Amino acid sequence: MKSLIKPTAAKRHINGIGRQFQSPLYVISIGSLVAVNFALAKYAVTIGIPPIDVAIIPMAGAAILLMTLLVMRGQLNRTALVHYRYYLWAGLLGVAIPNLASTYALQSLNTSTFSVLVTLSPIFTLLFTLPFQGSSLTWRKVLGIMVGVVAALSVTLSPQMNTSSPWSALAIALLVPIFLAAGNIYRSRAFPPLANPIVLAAGMLTLQSMIWLPFTHAVDGEFIPNGTGVLALMASLSALSYLLTFRFQRITDGLGFSQVGNVVTVVGVSIGITWYGEPLTLQLIAAVILLLISLYLFNHAKS
């Protein structure tokens, strides 16, 4: 007996299911990588590595790794230079300034307080995107963002968390979600549609490294003996996270990408529990559930 379901229809159905899970997987993967790197950055500045080195050297290492990948694949050519303006602004807004602000702020802030401010990234993105993407903004997307923010705040604003920090450090940390949001919007609106994601990630990181490396202590040959390993690990994680970022940017907008901030917060607090021995709380359990609801609402909203 012949099947009543045409192969092409079945294939489209399977592809549709795959696309539904694709965005949440990107959000969770990128958010987890970024959260681990924030924890490593906190550790790096704690053992005495200068904040500017923590912000820039892993970025340069990630650029080298991605450039090496392009050379091995034979994909490095003159066309990579076409998008230099994109490399400059996407890198400044979404990478260099947030990295510098976060490493300087983490000298004084604990990870929980810093996580509160990272959680503001979706809110700033929502505010920045209103003039440009109002047609794609639905009540389910807005609700998804709000639920995600509540999830992150539920684990960072509990009475057990110490949030007494210098105002200067809080002000610097506030720059992180503001510039991350601006970077989200710029990348989505200026994204070169046919560009290779690896080329974009490598080009952006390389240009930013050329700008900022002269300001690091590495140019003078000054290294913390036990800091090389953590910076190398951060470089590897950064390379993977930026590669995933540009792949994800092809299928989402600034609002969609902003959901990464919620994952960063929840995963960051989870790392605090395992690394610093903080207790497993009901707030964290509730946050994970709310985060899943947030991702579902946003990724199943009709434009």
Outline where the language-model segments fall.
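Glycine-/small-residue-enriched transmembrane alpha-helix faces in small-molecule transporters
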Residues: 2-57, 162-189, 211
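Transmembrane alpha-helices of multi-pass small-molecule transport proteins
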Residues: 2-6, 41, 46-97, 124-125, ...
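Juxtamembrane helix-entry segments on the extracytoplasmic side of multipass membrane proteins
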Residues: 19-23, 48-56, 79-85, 157-178, ...
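Cytoplasmic-side transmembrane-helix entry/capping segments in multi-pass membrane proteins
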Residues: 27, 82-90, 137-149, 169-170, ...
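Helix-helix packing/entry segments at the starts of transmembrane helices
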Residues: 31, 56-57, 113-120, 186-208, ...
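Specific transmembrane alpha-helical segments of multi-pass solute transporters/efflux pumps
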Residues: 33-38, 70-113, 118, 154, ...
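Specific alpha-helical transmembrane segments that line the substrate/conduction pathway
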Residues: 53-64, 93-94, 99-141, 176, ...
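Hydrophobic transmembrane alpha-helices of multi-pass small-molecule transport proteins
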Residues: 66, 88, 128, 137-159, ...
